[in-house]
Amino acid sequence: MIVLDEHLEGLGLEIVIGHWYPGKVSVIQKFRPGTLVKDDVIPVLLRQAKQPTFITINWPDFWRRASADKRYCLICFPLPRERTHEIPDLLRQVLKLKQFNTKAGRMGTVMRVTKKSVHYYRINDPQVYTLSI
């Protein structure tokens, strides 16, 4: 399951990603309809889903601040809102990497993705690793 942050809702990303991603694509608000979902609640909501991969452009609040958790994956894209159309292609590249091409390979990982690389850390390992894409 791919879960998009509230900043990405209504931009058509659900549809574009849904064309090639075989699982469900949703937005975080569907986990708590009718309420504002604050960043500190997102990990709690993600733990309720089955192996979700959370996508956000709000990287300052998650990258190196969020703890990796074996029940989900966080992927941060340091992009301004006007460049969010780049997310589906970048996400697809990340999901093709052998380290992250399965849910099991992604769980427990926090990533920051740019056009050229994926920086990531994992549960119980605070070291940041880098892969080229």
Name each model-derived stretch.
Residues 23-33:
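A short beta-strand-loop structural module common to alpha/beta enzyme folds
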Residues 31-33, 60, 80:
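Short, solvent-exposed coil/turn elements at secondary-structure transition points
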Residues 28-30, 57, 77, 113:
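Conserved beta-strand termini and adjacent loop/short-helix elements that scaffold enzyme active sites
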Residues 46-67:
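Acidic, metal-binding active-site segment of PIN/NYN-like and related structure-specific nucleases
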Residues 1-6, 10-21, 40, 62-133:
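Acidic, PIN/NYN-like endoribonuclease modules and their adjacent C-terminal/linker elements
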Residues 21-22, 50:
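Proline-centered flexible-loop/turn and helix-kink motifs
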